[in-house]
């Protein structure tokens, strides 16, 4: 049977047994902060086992996409070196939620294996938990397995637990004996590749309490899992998972790309490399298709490590170009029918992987050079361990994950000091913490809060009111500051990227200007910057304001215009986010935002610079939506799961409460958001992007303005265009572009002529200087400062100067933009007969100006930071020449 037939046969079998066939959950868990990746079929049903959720069915079956490349379940470093480990795999499984139990699970498993798939009964073994007599009897009495093939094991092998506490229970596994003579009984559960587990049937019947005792569950569940790649290899009679038709299309494509054929050898370097590349391409393609992005933290860094590990192995095949992105289409073709997201996201995933590959290849070569130097030094000193500090340098400077360095070291017969590496990592973290603590010390003025109420929390009423009567519950003064907490306030405190409101607080005596509003736990803190004493009719310092208990009542008024401008920008951010996901792809996820009354800034995951056409498309999409003037619907106090089910965007790594606020623009955008927004998107008026740039690898940033700020920007640009048109005496926009292009061409030509003229004049000056220069051992030595010249002119002049004397060596020096520029030359005869080296000589000169450089024997350049020592550099050059010539 082909692999796709085996998969479908499994699903059809359980569909006939009354199971609902459910789609695989994404490999990126949507609502489980304990997981980086989906690593088992049961992950999407975890809430059912924990009695926190339910399904509209009691029987289910699926094929689940899984990744095991981090944490407890981490197969990364074994991939390629054996025949059965994978970072990505499929898990076939069937489940019962309080419905059938051990009898059906065991007998159906046996039926599928021996009746439908016709696996040899004499080669199958069933293991049960040592105390699970019920399962033992079912195997013995309800199946025709050889009773001698029913084996009992203890907690380690046959008792499944979700964690230290929670649902758990005994399990029964089916193993197959692949030894030549069928003598593998003693190899069951010892980790021998000749007798392997095929299917694990877990019977969830207990709840492990914190004190360790087992409490029976009111409902018993069944959770089974079978590795798809493993069962395919067995049914196709292959000795390795990698020899089946699951991997053959990938190996064929790798051969097409590299010219290297897969030989199915366990130890051959080429075959190890091909297994790694094929496996890692699957992991990356599926993860990115489900919305993950490579990055420097969390799940993204695991994916980046996987990609870089595969690229390193591609060098073993003699291939030095991006390779993984070329396998995405092969996977989409082979598996897209079962997993349509591979086809839907193929183009974007390929582009993301290619961009990552190109980025790492630039540093890979430099890192390999450094690694080679380290290895050579160790060999010369008979060392065996690469220092942790060197491994950290490879990580910090060249992006080499530690396990990649360890892999390369093992290939060369060396080890890496892991403890030393971790020490360097910890030092870096400590420095970052120290910086943060220092900032906290600067921000903390040491003043104490005075509270007038036992209730410290503030109620926010600003969604519905911009003016509100409130009572002061807390006050803090000192160092020029006045901070106030109210029992209820219309002021929005900075959070979720939106800046805090400003406005006024007023009581019977004072009018206080609130410059900012921030959160401090559950309290909303109003930062007062200016105060006016109405009794004294004069301004007072905020720290001198005297508020007594009789004057705690205040009228709180938010600056209406500023709030409305911030709301325009915030709602526009939601529209832009949705437009980016439509235009660029669903891999776009918010990575950060800043929303103020003046502008908006949005950071998002994307792998390349946006083209002018893409930026224009985003602007057009947002402004088109604004003109639709749709209402903005705010849903308060929504269950998180209900919000996500209705399409609200929620991303792994973000923290959400059980109940959330949802901001919906019908048909356009649905997001979890606690910020303030316009009531109708038409009130945004106009949206204009002002910049797009990179802020980190795989993260782009867009800045934009809306409403009056956008109008102001457009009028400013229009006025500037009109001024340019008048200066150029141009008619129409095209004429302006043509005239400016013509001016630029003329400028370039004039600059070229000027440079040639200056170079010619400099050559003439230097030729005379060279003829007058002193000779040392028959070689003329020129060391001269050339004022009011740039480095490029000096380089051109130097090349011409080499023909002006048979044996000569020289150093030209100047100061350009406050930096020293040095250019050195040596004629062919000076190099050949006098063994002079311009590169070595210029390095001696550069030391005097705290600089460095180098080049070839005939020509070299250098720079420096100390113009005041220019004469010392010239003297050092001359001295070095004299020392060389004796």
From Swiss-Prot:
Among Gene3D superfamilies, the record links this protein to: 2.40.30.130, 3.10.310.40, 3.30.54.20, Bira Bifunctional Protein, Domain 2 (3.30.930.10), Threonyl-trna Synthetase, Chain A, domain 2 (3.30.980.10)
Query: Which cofactor names does the annotation list?
Result: Zn(2+)
Q: What family does the entry list? A: Belongs to the class-II aminoacyl-tRNA synthetase family.
What is a GO molecular function of this protein? zinc ion binding
One of the GO biological process terms: alanyl-tRNA aminoacylation
Record's keyword annotation contains Methyltransferase: no
Give residues annotated as binding Zn(2+).
Answer: 570, 574, 673, 677
Cellular component terms (Gene Ontology): cytoplasm
> Per UniProt, what is one Pfam family of this protein?
tRNA_SAD
Q: Which gene encodes it?
A: alaS
Designated name of the protein: Alanine--tRNA ligase
> Where does this polypeptide localize?
Cytoplasm
Description of its domains: Consists of three domains; the N-terminal catalytic domain, the editing domain and the C-terminal C-Ala domain. The editing domain removes incorrectly charged amino acids, while the C-Ala domain, along with tRNA(Ala), serves as a bridge to cooperatively bring together the editing and aminoacylation centers thus stimulating deacylation of misacylated tRNAs.
Annotated EC: 6.1.1.7
Checking CDD domains in the record gives: AlaRS_core (cd00673)
Cofactor binding note of this UniProt entry = Binds 1 zinc ion per subunit.
Free-text function comment from the UniProt entry: Catalyzes the attachment of alanine to tRNA(Ala) in a two-step reaction: alanine is first activated by ATP to form Ala-AMP and then transferred to the acceptor end of tRNA(Ala). Also edits incorrectly charged Ser-tRNA(Ala) and Gly-tRNA(Ala) via its editing domain.
Q: Which UniProt keywords apply?
A: Aminoacyl-tRNA synthetase, ATP-binding, Cytoplasm, Ligase, Metal-binding, Nucleotide-binding, Protein biosynthesis, RNA-binding, tRNA-binding, Zinc
Quote the catalytic activity from the record. tRNA(Ala) + L-alanine + ATP = L-alanyl-tRNA(Ala) + AMP + diphosphate
Q: Which organism is it from?
A: Chlorobium chlorochromatii (strain CaD3)
């Amino acid at each position: 049977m082909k692999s796709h037939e085996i998969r479908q046969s499994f699903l059809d079998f359980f569909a006939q047994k009354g199971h609902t066939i459910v789609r695989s959950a994404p490999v990126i868990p949507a609502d489980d902060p304990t997981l980086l990746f989906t690593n088992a079929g049961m992950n999407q049903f975890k809430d059912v086992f924990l009695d926190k959720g339910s399904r509209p069915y009691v029987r289910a079956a699926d094929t689940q996409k899984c990744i095991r490349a981090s944490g407890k379940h981490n197969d990364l470093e074994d991939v390629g070196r054996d025949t059965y480990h994978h970072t990505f795999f499929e898990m076939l499984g069937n489940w019962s939620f309080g419905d059938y139990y051990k009898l059906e699970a065991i007998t159906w498993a046996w039926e599928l294996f021996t009746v439908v798939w016709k696996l040899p009964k004499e080669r199958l073994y069933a293991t049960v938990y040592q105390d699970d007599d019920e399962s033992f009897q079912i195997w013995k009495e309800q199946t025709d397995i050889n009773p001698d093939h029913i084996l009992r094991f203890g907690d380690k092998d046959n008792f499944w637990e979700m964690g230290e506490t929670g649902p758990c229970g005994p399990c029964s596994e089916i193993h197959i004996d692949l030894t030549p003579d069928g003598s593998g009984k003693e190899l069951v559960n010892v980790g021998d590749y000749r007798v392997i587990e095929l299917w694990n049937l877990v019977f969830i019947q207990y709840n492990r309490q914190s004190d360790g005792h087992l409490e029976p569950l009111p409902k018993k569940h069944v959770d089974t899992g079978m590795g798809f790649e493993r069962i395919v290899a067995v049914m196709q009679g292959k000795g390795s998972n990698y020899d089946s038709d699951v991997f053959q299309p990938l190996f064929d494509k790798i051969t097409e790309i590299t010219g290297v054929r897969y030989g199915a050898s366990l130890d051959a370097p080429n075959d190890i490399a091909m297994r790694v590349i094929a496996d890692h391409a699957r992991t990356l393609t599926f993860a990115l298709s489900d919305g993950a992005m490579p990055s420097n933290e969390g799940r993204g860094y695991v994916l980046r490590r996987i990609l870089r590990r595969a690229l390193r192995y591609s060098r073993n095949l003699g291939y030095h170009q991006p390779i993984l992105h070329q396998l995405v289409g092969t996977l989409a073709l082979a598996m897209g029918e079962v997993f349509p997201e591979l086809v839907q996201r193929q183009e974007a995933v390929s582009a993301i992987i290619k961009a990552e590959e190109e980025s790492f290849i630039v540093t890979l070569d430099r890192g390999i050079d450094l690694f080679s130097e380290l290895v050579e030094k160790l060999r010369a000193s008979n060392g065996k361990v690469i220092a942790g500090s060197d491994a950290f340098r490879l990580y910090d400077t060249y992006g080499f994950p530690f396990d990649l360095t360890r892999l390369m070291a093992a290939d060369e017969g060396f080890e890496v000091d892991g403890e030393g590496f971790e020490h360097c990592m910890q030092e870096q973290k400590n420095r970052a913490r120290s910086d943060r603590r220092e900032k906290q010390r600067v921000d903390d003025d040491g003043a104490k809060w005075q509270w007038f109420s036992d209730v410290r929390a503030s109620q926010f009423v600003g969604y519905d009111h911009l003016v509100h009567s409130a009572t002061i519950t807390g006050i803090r003064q000192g160092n020029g500051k006045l901070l106030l907490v109210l029992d209820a306030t219309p002021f929005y405190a900075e959070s979720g990227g939106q800046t805090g409101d400003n406005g006024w607080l007023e009581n019977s005596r004072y009018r206080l200007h609130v410059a900012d509003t921030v959160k401090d736990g559950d309290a909303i803190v109003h930062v007062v910057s200016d105060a006016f004493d109405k009794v004294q009719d004069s301004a007072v310092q905020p720290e001198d304001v005297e508020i007594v208990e009789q004057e705690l009542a205040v009228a709180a008024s938010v600056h209406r215009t500023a709030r409305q401008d911030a709301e325009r920008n915030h709602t526009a951010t939601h529209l832009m986010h949705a437009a980016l996901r439509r235009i660029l792809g669903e891999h776009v996820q918010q990575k950060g935002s800043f929303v103020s009354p003046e502008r908006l800034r949005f950071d998002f995951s994307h792998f390349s610079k946006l083209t002018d056409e893409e930026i224009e498309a985003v602007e057009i999409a947002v402004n088109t939506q604004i003109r639709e003037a749709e209402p903005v619907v705010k849903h308060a106090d929504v269950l998180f799961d209900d919000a996500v089910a209705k399409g609200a965007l929620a991303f792994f790594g973000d923290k959400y409460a059980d109940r959330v606020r949802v901001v919906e623009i019908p048909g356009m955008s649905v997001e979890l958001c606690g910020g303030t927004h316009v009531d109708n998107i038409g009130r945004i008026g106009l949206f204009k992007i002002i910049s797009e740039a990179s802020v980190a690898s795989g993260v782009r940033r867009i800045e934009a303005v809306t409403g009056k700020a956008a109008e102001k920007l457009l009028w400013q640009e229009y006025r500037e265009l009109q001024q340019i048109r008048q200066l150029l005496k141009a008619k129409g926009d095209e004429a302006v572009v043509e005239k400016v292009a013509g001016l630029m061409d003329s400028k370039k030509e004039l600059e070229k002529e000027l440079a040639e003229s200056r170079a010619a004049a400099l050559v003439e000056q230097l030729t005379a200087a060279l003829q007058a220069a002193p000779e040392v051992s028959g070689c003329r030595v020129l060391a001269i400062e050339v004022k009011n010249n740039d480095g490029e002119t000096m380089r051109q002049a130097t090349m011409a100067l080499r023909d002006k004397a048979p044996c000569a060596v020289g150093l030209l020096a100047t100061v350009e933009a406050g930096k020293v520029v040095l250019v050195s030359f040596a004629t062919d005869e000076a190099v050949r007969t006098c063994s002079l080296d311009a590169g070595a000589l210029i390095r001696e000169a550069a030391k005097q100006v705290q600089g460095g450089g180098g080049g070839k024997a005939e020509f070299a350049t250098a720079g420096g930071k100390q113009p005041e020592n220019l004469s010392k550099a010239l003297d050092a050059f001359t001295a070095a020449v004299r020392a060389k010539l004796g």
